[in-house]
Amino acid sequence: MKLSLSFFCLLLSSVLLSQEHQVRFDQIDVVHYEFEMELNDENDNIDATASVSLIFKEASTKFSLDLVGLTDGKGMTVKRVLTAKNQELRFEHSNDLLTIYTEQAAGASGTFIIEYSGIPKTGLIIAKNKHGDRTFFGDNWPDRGKNWLPIVDHPSDKATVQWVITAPDHYKVVGNGELIEEKPLGNGRATTTWKSTVKIPTKVMVIGAARFAVEESGKVRGTPISSWVYPQDEKNGFHDYALAVSITEWFINTVGPYPYAKLANVQSKTQFGGMENASNIFYSENSVRGDRSAEGLIAHEIAHQWFGNSASEADWHHVWLS
């Protein structure tokens, strides 16, 4: 009886969530996100500006994005919302929804700038790794991205994304897509920019920042494949993750062209054994052993670049695909 009741509640929650998102799908189409974010070593607070570009499918007076609000010291606080022309807009932030008021005609497009800050409850894992070094890893699957990003947090809602991450310069930053720039600021900090011109779901839209040793393992059909591991695990990590080259080649020959600009294989603090983030897979930090025992895990996560990322779920009841 308890099991049946729990299943019914879960089913009802899924139905209501799907209905809520369907209203948004009928109203707006997000085409691009840009996240500018400041990370620091003093505390777990992030300061961020999100630029969300979208098209209005129907005449609207408001629209909503998912963003977890502040409770018990954690969550995001929105400072202000602006248009691309620097006009302040009225907004409400409650029940983990950011509602922005704006008069728009059907077919109109616009970019909306959201300034916010806070300590993520989850979604962005800020923690010491097994060697005691501080790290930052996005861990959005399946719907935890809204804990640190204002987004339409649904597996079928794809958009392009650009990350502009400023952090202490002892960190290397990895993100979706192609590396655009690494810019030292001369004050012990640096800004790293990554951009995906391929639309991806928010569940696999992430960055990672840590002390990394990085090696290009090889190229397959022009696609660079790299390994990002903790410096203490450099020898074993490069040996283990180099398997990704032959595995990726097999999938390209068997399935079809690789869908993204690169493939980075990253030792991380993900709560999962592995997480198939688009073009930068995050593996458990314990996946590095030096004996290539993670071959099955690596193949599994690389397969998701096609199945789960490029071909993604239409709704929550399909989430088994990833």
Residue ranges and their predicted role:
Residues 70-132, 188, 193:
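A surface-exposed beta-strand-loop module
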Residues 22-25, 106, 115-162, 215-217:
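Glycine/proline-rich low-complexity spacer/linker segments in large multi-domain proteins
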Residues 48, 139-143, 151-299, 316:
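Hydrophobic helix-coil surface modules that form long, contiguous segments used
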Residues 1-22:
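Bacterial Sec-dependent N-terminal signal peptides
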Residues 16-51, 55-57, 130-135:
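N-terminal, polar/Ser/Thr-rich
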